[in-house]
UniProtKB/Swiss-Prot annotation:
<dbReference type="GO" id="GO:0003746">
    <property type="term" value="F:translation elongation factor activity"/>
</dbReference>
<dbReference type="InterPro" id="IPR038363">
    <property type="entry name" value="LepA_C_sf"/>
</dbReference>
<dbReference type="InterPro" id="IPR027417">
    <property type="entry name" value="P-loop_NTPase"/>
</dbReference>
<dbReference type="InterPro" id="IPR005225">
    <property type="entry name" value="Small_GTP-bd"/>
</dbReference>
<keyword id="KW-0378">Hydrolase</keyword>
<feature type="binding site">
    <location>
        <begin position="130"/>
        <end position="133"/>
    </location>
    <ligand>
        <name>GTP</name>
    </ligand>
</feature>
<dbReference type="GO" id="GO:0005886">
    <property type="term" value="C:plasma membrane"/>
</dbReference>
<dbReference type="InterPro" id="IPR009000">
    <property type="entry name" value="Transl_B-barrel_sf"/>
</dbReference>
<protein>
    <recommendedName>
        <fullName>Elongation factor 4</fullName>
        <ecNumber>3.6.5.n1</ecNumber>
    </recommendedName>
</protein>
<dbReference type="Pfam" id="PF03144">
    <property type="entry name" value="GTP_EFTU_D2"/>
</dbReference>
<dbReference type="InterPro" id="IPR035654">
    <property type="entry name" value="LepA_IV"/>
</dbReference>
<keyword id="KW-1003">Cell membrane</keyword>
<dbReference type="GO" id="GO:0005525">
    <property type="term" value="F:GTP binding"/>
</dbReference>
<dbReference type="InterPro" id="IPR000640">
    <property type="entry name" value="EFG_V-like"/>
</dbReference>
<feature type="binding site">
    <location>
        <begin position="14"/>
        <end position="19"/>
    </location>
    <ligand>
        <name>GTP</name>
    </ligand>
</feature>
<dbReference type="InterPro" id="IPR035647">
    <property type="entry name" value="EFG_III/V"/>
</dbReference>
<comment type="function">
    <text>Required for accurate and efficient protein synthesis under certain stress conditions. May act as a fidelity factor of the translation reaction, by catalyzing a one-codon backward translocation of tRNAs on improperly translocated ribosomes. Back-translocation proceeds from a post-translocation (POST) complex to a pre-translocation (PRE) complex, thus giving elongation factor G a second chance to translocate the tRNAs correctly. Binds to ribosomes in a GTP-dependent manner.</text>
</comment>
């Protein structure tokens, strides 16, 4: 046990941690040359393409130093803000962390938030400046930032490059010398911390865990504390490039368990595994149920695909326990599901995976957040969907979730960023200068304003330099109204949104204009209206396409032409009464991209 080292890598998106991890695997001969592809640990195609890590991964390496053999367990963590709970559980399974900072970009918001998490868990931090081979690298300046943040010595910072392999041996030495061995009791009752689970179509759910106390053997009868379910350990083992079965996984080691579990709801990240015969007195601290933050309706384009969509979502849920869904129906779109996501990136990834892995074409409605609605009698209910809102006369007030956001940016872009945050109803909390030309700005913002396009706009006004991180802060009372969109007097429930009173008129006008561009012209006139309650606040009209019925009349009496025109008008009127308006998928998504 004294020769085991468990460590994770903390880095902002695109700071090169997956590439550096590849070098570590190569250097310790965990991966042979023929198996080596870029980003070995990112095993979903989507992860490689987007260059982000979505799931936590783990891999074991052997390393020999000064004649001693060591076992190093690298637990790779997602770097994106949506997956911060997964990161926190992965960090809890480690004793040390490599803090990787891009030599060209410096410290970013995500790096800082994950670093604080690591420091809270008492991890040993090994600072690394990566990508020093880039022509635009500024290693000295970035080292100054790290020293200011960590208060470490300049000599402790390792300069490395994932591309050329520079500094890899120093990193491995530092891991062995500085990261403490796991402190567990081999004779205590079994406690394993689950930090991830994956779904295998043949073996069911495979849980990845770190043994904190005791040890687990093949064939043991075990119990998962949070779900109180019991299983037999059909197979336990360690995670090399593939899974390697072992008869026993000892204290401090990282391994996997296969026990024929069918659904991901039974394996919760952060749960504790213990023996049924000799159970641990308590679970490992820090487990929490992950709560979705952003909700959206997901509907199949073809109505008969409803059951397929259900099975696809269930399969995705096997691999992604933070996705929640329940059936709902909409007048405009038929039957579908109300899905809960951790954040916008998570929502996009789920959509892409539905498309790629299951070939499902879906329509997604406008995302919204969950609101607390208080009625006049003092009761409170959570509303995830604008159509679930009670009558306005019954509502006393509505509270919406606020987040505390931290934006790190170059001082040149402070003005435009503050304008953006004010436009989103933000309240400035404080600002701190990190170094001469970098500043961290803290804002309280309503989550509902952020879910749509905040991140894209932030990136574009700061030329890609600003980075953004947030956590839920509290619920606050807001003046919110439900905005309905009517087509020819019929409300389209999938386009309803909750919006703030001050922005409602401009938002309604922009929605109508956008829909006018996107809905194709019909044989009859279409009125697009935005309404709050019974009051219409904006309107656009799509003119009908019409045939020139008087073309075949040459000269002659005007009454003949008038008769034909009247006849056409009658026909159009009848059409309008029975005609339905098709709303294309683009229109539902356009709401997200209103500028």
């Amino acid at each position: 046990m004294k020769n085991i080292r468990n460590f994770c890598i903390i880095a902002h998106i695109d700071h090169g941690k997956s590439t550096l991890a590849d070098r570590l695997l190569e250097y310790t001969n965990t991966v042979s040359g023929k198996d080596l592809q870029d980003q070995v640990l990112d095993n979903m195609d989507l992860e490689r393409e987007r260059g982000i890590t979505i799931k936590s991964h783990a891999i074991q390496m052997d390393y020999e130093m000064d004649g001693e053999k060591y076992v190093l367990n690298l637990i790779d963590t997602p770097g994106h803000v949506d997956f911060s709970y997964e990161v926190s559980r992965s960090i809890a399974a480690c004793e040390g962390a490599l803090l990787i900072v891009d030599a060209a970009q410096g410290i970013q918001a995500q790096t800082i938030s994950n670093l604080y998490m690591a420091i809270e868990n008492d991890l040993t931090i090994i600072p690394i400046v990566n990508k020093v081979d880039l022509p635009s690298a500024m290693p000295e300046e970035v080292e100054d930032q790290i020293i200011e943040l960590l208060g470490c010595d300049r000599s402790e910072i390792i300069r490395a490059s994932g591309k050329t392999g520079q500094g890899v041996d120093q990193i491995l030495r530092a891991i062995v010398e500085q990261v403490p061995a796991p402190a567990g009791d081999p004779d205590a009752p079994l406690q394993c911390l689950i930090f991830d689970s994956v779904f295998n179509p043949f073996r069911g759910i495979i849980a990845y865990f770190k043994v904190v106390n005791g040890s687990i053997r093949k064939g043991d009868h075990v119990k998962f504390i949070a779900t109180e379910k019991e299983y037999d350990a059909d197979e336990v083992g360690v995670l090399r490039l593939d899974m390697e079965p072992r008869s026993e996984v000892k204290t401090g080691d990282v391994g996997y368990i296969i026990s024929g579990i069918k659904t991901s709801r039974e394996v919760k990240v952060g749960d504790t595994i213990t023996h049924v015969a000799k159970p641990a007195k308590e679970a490992i601290a820090g487990f929490e149920e992950v709560k979705p933050m952003v909700f959206a309706g997901v509907y199949p384009i073809e109505a008969e695909d409803f059951e397929n969509l259900r099975t696809s979502l269930e399969k995705l849920q096997l691999n992604d326990a933070s996705l929640t869904f329940q059936p709902e129906s909409s007048v405009a779109l038929g039957f579908g599901f109300r899905c809960g996501f951790l954040g916008l990136l998570h929502m996009e990834i789920v959509q892409e995976r539905l498309d790629r892995e299951f070939n499902m074409n879906v329509i997604t409605t406008v995302p919204n957040v969950s609101y607390k609605v208080y009625d006049k009698k003092g009761g409170c209910k959570e509303v995830h969907n604008p159509s679930g809102l009670p009558e306005p006369t019954l509502i006393d007030h509505i509270e919406e979730p606020f987040i505390r956001a931290s934006v790190i940016t170059n001082t040149a872009y402070i003005g435009p960023i503050m304008t953006l945050c004010l436009g989103k109803r933000g309240v400035l909390v404080k600002q701190e200068y990190i170094s001469g030309d970098r500043v961290e700005i803290f804002y309280d913002l309503p989550l509902g304003e952020i879910v749509i396009d905040f991140y894209d706009k932030l990136k574009s006004i700061s030329k890609g330099y600003a980075s953004f991180d947030y956590h839920l802060h509290d619920f606050r009372e807001s003046k919110l109204v439900k905005l309905d969109i009517l087509l020819n007097g019929e409300p389209v429930d999938a386009l309803s949104t909750l919006t703030h009173v001050d922005n409602s008129v401009t938002f309604g006008q922009r929605m109508c204009e956008k829909l006018k561009e996107l809905i194709p012209r019909q044989q009859f006139e279409i009125a697009i209206q935005a309404a709050i309650g019974a009051k219409i606040i904006a309107r656009e009209t799509i003119k009908p396409v019409r045939k020139d019925v008087t073309a075949k009349c040459y000269g002659g009496d005007i009454s003949r032409k008038r008769k034909l025109l009247e006849k056409q008008k009658e026909g159009k009127k009848r059409m309008k009464q029975i005609g339905t308006v098709e709303v294309p998928q683009k229109a539902f998504l356009a709401v997200l991209k209103l500028d």
